Amino acid sequence: MAGESTNSVGNDITSLIQPGLDQVIQDEGVQVTLINSILGWCRIHIINPVKSSKIVKSRAFQITMIVLGIILLIAGLALTFVLQGQLGNNAFLFLIPAVIGLVKLLATSVFMEKPCTPEKWRLCKRLLATTEDILDDGQINQSNTIFTMDSSESTNAAAS
């Protein structure tokens, strides 16, 4: 019986918070603050211990990681758009190196301890929307559901 009352209290609280939460999460400032909080936690608990190793401190390693990220990103995107006609729906497989390259570049920027800005977040949302659009059916046709272009365009309009 005690478990049922706890669940009903949890559901009541959730129903009270949900309408305000939906509105707040659409605010770009809240999104950027949340991202910076997550990046801060990752920096303290994951990145700083790795960063203290000698190999990661070397300049050659840092330059190699940046170059590798750029090469993977450009090669993946180029192959996706060049070979999409021949491969059909399987062309999205070439996005895997592009996504790995993007993650590598984002991780490199975290290593350089630069905070996320609204401009970077808009660019990231636009890239994620395009990636999702290609991954869902192999075509750019605005069929994405998670990262929609409407949300990134509305934040662009609000920022202007």
Curated annotation (Swiss-Prot):
Top-level taxon of origin: Bacteria
Membrane topology type: Multi-pass membrane protein
Signal peptide as annotated in the record: none
One GO CC annotation: outer membrane
Keyword RNA-binding: no
Alphabetical list of Pfam families matching this protein: CRPA
Cross-referenced InterPro entries: CRPA (IPR008436)
Keywords for the protein's UniProt record, in alphabetical order: Membrane, Transmembrane, Transmembrane helix
Compartment list: Membrane
Chief subcellular location: membrane
TM region(s), chain numbering: 63-83, 92-112
Protein name, UniProt field: Sulfur-rich protein
Organism expressing this protein natively: Chlamydia abortus (strain DSM 27085 / S26/3) (Chlamydophila abortus)
